[in-house]
């Protein structure tokens, strides 16, 4: 599936794409920005994923006058800024361990990266050079068209990796998405566990997003 997306991007995103695309053909937008653009919206938050090593990314962006926050390097994530725009740039990752909030990660493939994400609609990758939408789970595009919310893999496993995903499911339900039966059953059966393992600060963020704040 090829998607014409560039007219949906704010101008501030193009400098990041220019640097990344000069280094590799493997540059993807992923997650909410892809989901929202496919729904016809203009997203504000952008996450990139690439195969360029962290050290090279840091060197190239700093040489180009970008600000680079390296606090997430151990998790293979950088926050990179230019002007008023900040984006997240990560490598393809695979979870080695997870305690319900924090994951220990290692380098992985695009398939690994997709299968560590929460919902199929958030596991879509858009190649910025070709416009190709890559759907490693095989369900993301169809679920988005049908407004179906489906956890990637086993719902209870995904929730236990990050209990905030239970609250996030509610947020998407409030936006008109329908939880598929296995996902809905998991949220219902695990609700007390989700509640007991969620910090007020992170829940507040999800509730504010639900309310459009």
Q: Which residues does each predicted region cover?
A:
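Catalytic cores of the polymerase beta-like nucleotidyltransferase superfamily
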Residues: 1-213
């Amino acid at each position: 599936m090829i998607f014409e997306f560039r007219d949906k991007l704010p101008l501030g995103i193009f400098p990041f794409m220019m640097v990344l695309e000069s280094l590799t053909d493997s540059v993807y937008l992923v997650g909410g920005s892809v989901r929202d653009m496919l729904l016809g919206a203009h997203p504000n938050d952008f996450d990139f994923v690439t195969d360029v090593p962290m050290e090279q990314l840091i060197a190239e962006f700093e040489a180009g006058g970008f600000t680079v926050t390296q606090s997430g390097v151990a998790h293979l994530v950088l926050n990179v800024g230019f002007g008023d725009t900040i984006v997240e740039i990560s490598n393809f990752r695979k979870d080695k361990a997870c305690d319900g909030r924090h994951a220990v990660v290692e380098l992985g493939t695009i398939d690994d990266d997709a299968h560590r994400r929460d919902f199929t609609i958030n596991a879509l990758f858009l190649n910025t050079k070709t416009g190709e939408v890559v759907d490693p789970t095989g369900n993301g595009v169809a679920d988005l068209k049908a407004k179906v919310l489906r956890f990637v893999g086993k719902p209870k496993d995904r929730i236990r990796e990050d209990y905030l995903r239970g609250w996030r499911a509610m947020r998407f339900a409030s936006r008109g998405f329908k939880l598929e039966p296995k996902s809905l059953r998991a949220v219902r059966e695990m609700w007390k566990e989700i509640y007991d393992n969620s910090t007020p600060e992170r829940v507040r963020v999800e509730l504010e997003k639900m309310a459009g704040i």
